[in-house]
């Protein structure tokens, strides 16, 4: 053994060839934390000191290669002064450079996922051989930063600036065949041939058949582009990427600027450019929010995994109520491998559900994400039925009938008598109390809520609602099924609106107040879209459905009359009474035309102004900042109340629910992280400025206490 640490070992393989293996003890994956970086330095020193070494193969003892840096260390590291961040990155790069500068050839054997620092380690090697099942990429832009271990320097010098910009700015994982095509790897082999492939390359390099020094040289030099080529490549890319990323996500464009600035430098000077740009991005609020989001997501996955121990295996599912929603649920279950019965009392509803599932599967085939054979397999896994004949072996039933408590209670009581005693019943409801629905059941311990968001195939969140009598097994089984469907489940306790809708309706309440104060709804939409929402509140209401919003508003007002009940008519009342129901009937706040692709396109319709005129009670002058605060303060305060009331267990789950469920701007991190970014004391003072707007704007006593004590939601 040439070197042995807790993360890295170096041992002889054969005839002067050694294996530098990453295998971080006590972890399921390899990652570049402080320990691993320090051991890499020591391992490289040990190799350099051993005259018998003729070549190095870099490998992994895990199923993955290296997943990247240890993101948990970013939180503290990024609080350091910018100059210290630059120094830290340059120190790390000295280690990578020392490996790259070894006087012997090096080959990276990529067995699994190699992301971020993992790929940057591979780029420092002379050759890369990749398993057909592996994936590589530089996803740092998704964290609001860009590669900091040489990725912006080595990758463009290996695969060309255009390809490198595409890889770095998109941040996606790349398949082996795509990596080979652009020259990011030198060979692709079957998983069982990976070591043999690496040995073949290293032996050919040792023998002189391959000139490893010539292969290494371009990574040490400036980019081979003249001034005109640079201008065309970089200026065009910056314009395109800026349009794609938008103004709230600076990292992709900053990565291009770094590559451009370093284009005329050799490796060492280019790495200084990279380190300076990386440190600048690391200090932004966008990076802080996106890293927080990543850590929240990891926390969600850990919590969901904890349910696996007691969850029952779902081998056969069923959905009650076909149509668009039922068809979407059936599609999601079938395409992820769980056969599902789709029951309705009407043949036309069954056909609608099958058409929806077939359309979604066909779209995946068209995009190359599914083979025709897999599409047929998924369609065969959806069994339509008008009766309960095959329900005896169903493990979970998702009830997705009309949003009416009496109808739901009747359907749930009926199906309970048709399934086995331990089958789970789950109601896909957005507003109706799970405890209320449970009263109709003989086995309420087997009953939970399972709230899907529309459209089911696109929205990642599922709220699993625990009722007073829901058993841990029922909750765990539903969480496991949601995960199996490819969703991100969050367990919440029962209350009107649960988490997401309870928080969303105060946001709509702020919007209603603005419209009643004479503020143009088109202006409100533009301001909130600029703030970062995927669509403004008026457009969102149209997409959700004015009738749905009207019903939900009434449910929330009944549940929380002290702050959500408003005796005055609102914009939603006016539209609902005028049968302007949104996209579903072609007119709401906006009117809707069909574009060339058959999708609804919103257009301004002046007739809506006459509809809204009776509910405008004043003409108040407000700034764009006021608009944001009228909307965001009640949303944030309701999120605080959900956490305080125990509706959601952690701040991480609350924030992720809003990001996944209603498109809360990811670069702002979620409602509670947004409060943190302002400062809790500052947010309380801000809310107090709008106290005259009503109880939705009044901070809780506990939040005031947090402000007084200088506390945060995330430390």
UniProtKB/Swiss-Prot annotation:
Pfam families: 3HCDH (PF00725), 3HCDH_N (PF02737), ECH_1 (PF00378). The active site is at 451 (for 3-hydroxyacyl-coa dehydrogenase activity). Transmembrane segments: none annotated. Substrate binds at residues 297, 501, 660. It catalyses: a (3S)-3-hydroxyacyl-CoA + NAD(+) = a 3-oxoacyl-CoA + NADH + H(+); a (3S)-3-hydroxyacyl-CoA = a (2E)-enoyl-CoA + H2O; a 4-saturated-(3S)-3-hydroxyacyl-CoA = a (3E)-enoyl-CoA + H2O; (3S)-3-hydroxybutanoyl-CoA = (3R)-3-hydroxybutanoyl-CoA. Its EC number is 4.2.1.17, 5.1.2.3, 5.3.3.8, 1.1.1.35. Gene3D superfamilies: 1.10.1040.50, 2-enoyl-CoA Hydratase, Chain A, domain 1, NAD(P)-binding Rossmann-like Domain. InterPro entries: 3-OHacyl-CoA_DH_CS, 3-OHacyl-CoA_DH_NAD-bd, 3HC_DH_C, 6-PGluconate_DH-like_C_sf, ClpP/crotonase-like_dom_sf, Enoyl-CoA_hyd/isom_CS, Enoyl-CoA_hydra/iso, FA_oxidation_alpha_subunit. Residues 1-190 are annotated as: Enoyl-CoA hydratase/isomerase. The record marks 120, 140 as: Important for catalytic activity. Involved in the aerobic and anaerobic degradation of long-chain fatty acids via beta-oxidation cycle. Catalyzes the formation of 3-oxoacyl-CoA from enoyl-CoA via L-3-hydroxyacyl-CoA. It can also use D-3-hydroxyacyl-CoA and cis-3-enoyl-CoA as substrate. Heterotetramer of two alpha chains (FadB) and two beta chains (FadA). This is Fatty acid oxidation complex subunit alpha. It comes from Pseudomonas putida (strain ATCC 700007 / DSM 6899 / JCM 31910 / BCRC 17059 / LMG 24140 / F1). The gene is fadB.
